[in-house]
């Protein structure tokens, strides 16, 4: 993947501005509410009966924050995202058996939450760079499935 200077700067800027403990949990909770079939991977997380239970679940919050911090690895290794996530791809495909389409669903929810947090600063150009970044991450996480 080729990154422009604008894209690199934009991705770093986004991750320097967002609140991980807010955005991560909100994105994961949104994914679980909007796409309820994704809840099957979180059976050990307790009550996911409705939106209120999901958004108030401390395990969902913690995992959402963990996911967002996991994206830091891609931000720091933008030229080698595929290898950066090689082990995580194996874990999700061979151990957790996560449907790789769910990575895209989560990335869409993350885009919505980040847009809400950044407001007018989340221009079309910024969104394009962010979605390109997330598409590379999603592809890398799904790599083991191919």
Swiss-Prot record:
**CDD domains listed in its UniProt record:** Hb-beta-like
The answer, when asked if Iron is one of the entry's keywords, is yes
- Residue ranges constituting the Globin domain according to the UniProt record: 2-146
What is the primary gene name for this protein?
hbb2
The record's account of tissue expression is: Red blood cells.
Q: What is this protein called?
A: Hemoglobin subunit beta-2
Q: Is the keyword Iron assigned to this protein?
A: yes
Q: Which GO terms describe its biological process?
A: hydrogen peroxide catabolic process; oxygen transport
Pfam assignment, any one = Globin
Q: Which SUPFAM superfamilies match?
A: Globin-like
Question: Tell me, how does this one assemble?
Answer: Hb2 is a heterotetramer of two alpha chains and two beta-2 chains.
Task: Give this protein's Gene Ontology molecular function annotations.
Answer: haptoglobin binding; heme binding; metal ion binding; organic acid binding; oxygen binding; oxygen carrier activity; peroxidase activity
Q: What are the entry keywords? A: Heme, Iron, Metal-binding, Oxygen transport, Transport
- Role description: Involved in oxygen transport from gills to the various peripheral tissues.
Family, per entry: Belongs to the globin family.
State any GO CC term.
Answer: blood microparticle
Can you tell me which residues bind heme b?
Answer: 63, 92
Lineage of the organism: Eukaryota, Metazoa, Chordata, Craniata, Vertebrata
